[in-house]
Regions:
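A generic fold-level signal
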Residues: 1, 12, 100-102, 161, ...
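Conserved beta-strand hairpin/beta-sheet module of binuclear metal-dependent hydrolase folds
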Residues: 1-45, 119-129
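A short helix-to-beta-strand connector/capping loop
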Residues: 2-4, 87-88, 162
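Hydrophobic residues at beta-strand termini and immediately following loops
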Residues: 9, 92, 110
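Active-site HxH/HxHxD metal-binding segment of metal-dependent hydrolases
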Residues: 12, 26, 33-104, 137, ...
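Metallo-beta-lactamase
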Residues: 26, 104, 109, 115-189
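Short secondary-structure boundary segments
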Residues: 31, 54, 78-79, 122, ...
Length: 189
């Protein structure tokens, strides 16, 4: 199996964008601006996917420029495409899998922060956008509430191994184990 590299790129609006490199292929999760910072991290790999965790501007501001530079396919959930008047080449849903350089990238739908919030699981690496942050949850969409988001985190994310690394859309990386121990939203009341 090929080697996996994960590069965190801090983009405008304090958004964490991630470049995943495996077997000569790449994916970008949450392409902020400037897109040139992301292109510079591709290291001769072919960009296959531009993946959006949710439709807020900072998390996809570089999508169109990155697509123009690379012709990669864009993917997001249809609920956020409709809610934020966005478009994508692929409308992703819970359980979808994308192949990337010999690895399987699994899509996990976690509505709460936005109706179409997605997380992406690659091996034991979980990219959570604003669904789960270190020590917190992302602010909920007006049409949802913290209980729905918390239910999705508990039922879809905390069933993963506790040693799963978590890469949120803002702030520092963490792990599911650390979040179970320290995140006040995840502790029993």
């Amino acid at each position: 199996m090929s080697k996996l590299s994960i590069v965190k790129v801090r983009t405008d609006k304090d958004v964490n964008s991630f470049v995943l490199l495996a077997g000569g292929e790449a994916a970008v999760i949450d392409p902020g601006e400037p897109a040139a910072k992301l292109v510079g991290q591709l290291d001769k790999s072919k960009l296959r996917y531009i993946l959006i965790t949710h439709g807020h501007p900072g998390h996809l501001a570089g999508k169109d420029a990155l697509k123009a530079a690379t012709a990669a396919e864009t993917g997001m959930h249809v609920a956020d495409a409709k809610a934020f008047l966005r478009s994508a080449d692929i409308y992703l849903k819970d359980g979808d899998e994308l192949e990337l350089g010999g690895f399987q990238l699994r899509v996990i739908h976690t509505p709460g922060h936005t109706p179409g919030s997605l997380c992406f699981l690659l091996g034991n690496h979980l990219f959570t956008g604003d669904t789960l942050l270190a020590g917190s949850l992302g602010k909920q969409a007006p049409e949802t509430d913290v209980r729905q988001q918390l239910y999705n985190v508990l039922s879809k994310l905390l069933v993963l191994p506790l040693n799963t690394a978590v890469y949120p859309g803002h702030g520092s990386a963490t792990s599911l184990e650390a979040e179970v121990r320290t995140n006040p939203y995840l502790r029993p009341r």
